[in-house]
Amino acid sequence: MLVLRVKIINIMITNSNTNNMKNTKFPKLLILGNARHGKDTFAEILRDHMGLSFQSSSQAAADIFIYDELKVKYGYETPEECFEDRVNHRAEWFDLITAYNSEDRSRLAKSILEINDCYVGMRNRKEVEGCIKEGVFDYIIWVDASERLPLEAGDSFDIDKSYAHFILENNGTLKEFTKKVLAIGGLLKYDEFPNVIPVMVD
């Protein structure tokens, strides 16, 4: 068993390094965490600096089926409008995605990963466990901003950080968070960690 320790403050990544990384393929990633804790920001940083392709589970679900399910009920005119309003109906979205994945817990995840490196924002514990069982993801990353932001209600999110290979704290500034994200991104693109155990990156 490999024990990974990451000291973010001592890892320096230059612009030229990150530009070169855009030509290197990412492993398949799952980004987890409570609402508004920085999951999309994590993926956006890796996209902009290292070429990661990603799609949030909510955006994919809106495009694939939730817009059609809810457009009459809430008067949505586009999938984008449906997606933007998800914050007002999180429990309903949770139930719809759970139903969509009822016969295959990894159904939505596999659809997203057909054209992306990363799935952002899975919310159901059974779906995470189903994806782990099928080996859908190479690494799972948890983004944690719990020192400055509230946790999410259990009726729309029932996952905890115990599933993660990496736990990344986001309780400081955006600049600090960006350094941590780039450090982990560099490790994931250039090294292999076949038996990583969960660690806290702070």
For each predicted feature, which ranges?
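Small-molecule kinase domains that catalyze NTP-dependent phosphoryl transfer to phosphate-bearing small molecules
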Residues: 107, 142-202
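Hydrophobic anchor at the beta1->P-loop junction of P-loop NTPases
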Residues: 31
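ATP-dependent NMP and nucleoside kinases share a basic, alpha-helical "lid"
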Residues: 110-153
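P-loop (Walker A) phosphate-binding loop of NTP-binding proteins
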Residues: 34
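ATP-dependent small-molecule kinase phosphotransfer cores
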Residues: 57-117, 123
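ATP-binding Walker
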Residues: 37
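Walker A/P-loop
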Residues: 40
